[in-house]
UniProtKB/Swiss-Prot annotation:
SUPFAM superfamilies: L21p-like
Organism: Acidothermus cellulolyticus (strain ATCC 43068 / DSM 8971 / 11B)
Source taxon at top rank: Bacteria
Molecular functions (GO terms): rRNA binding; structural constituent of ribosome
Role: This protein binds to 23S rRNA in the presence of protein L20.
Entry-linked PANTHER family: 50S RIBOSOMAL PROTEIN L21, LARGE RIBOSOMAL SUBUNIT PROTEIN BL21M
Location of the region described as Disordered in the Swiss-Prot/TrEMBL record: 107-136
Designated name of the protein: Large ribosomal subunit protein bL21
Similarity annotation: Belongs to the bacterial ribosomal protein bL21 family.
Subunit structure, interactors included: Part of the 50S ribosomal subunit. Contacts protein L20.
Encoding gene, per UniProt annotation: rplU
Comp. bias intervals (Low complexity): 121-136
Key words of the record: Ribonucleoprotein, Ribosomal protein, RNA-binding, rRNA-binding
Amino acid sequence: MYAIVRGGGRQHRVAVGDVIEINAAAKGATATVGATVELPAVLVVDGPSVTTGATALADITVTGEVVGHAKGPKIRILKYKNKTGYRRRVGHRQPLALVKVTHIGPRAAADRKTAPKRASAKAAADQTTAAQATAE
């Protein structure tokens, strides 16, 4: 079983036990070592069955544990203007979070999000008039 998950602005193919590097500026990835993060699934493959679509994936969760932090490769930025002697060199290393995938599967019943039931417009109007009548 494996899943394609979104993390840090990229998509990663993960299986249980894999360690992935995600952008530490992403939501949840700045957590301390040992914290649990949930990665949104884009696609889940379990043998011959492939699960896609937002409604089908709403019941599936991919959780991981932050096992460490690292820095990405050095990127050198150079600004140069001709004939003026202006040169400026700057470097950058992106902070990364190392996340070990611990679970791919159905979401626990307590974690499922249920949409609140909406009252019809007529029922809402009746409640408003009843409240006004009792207030008078």
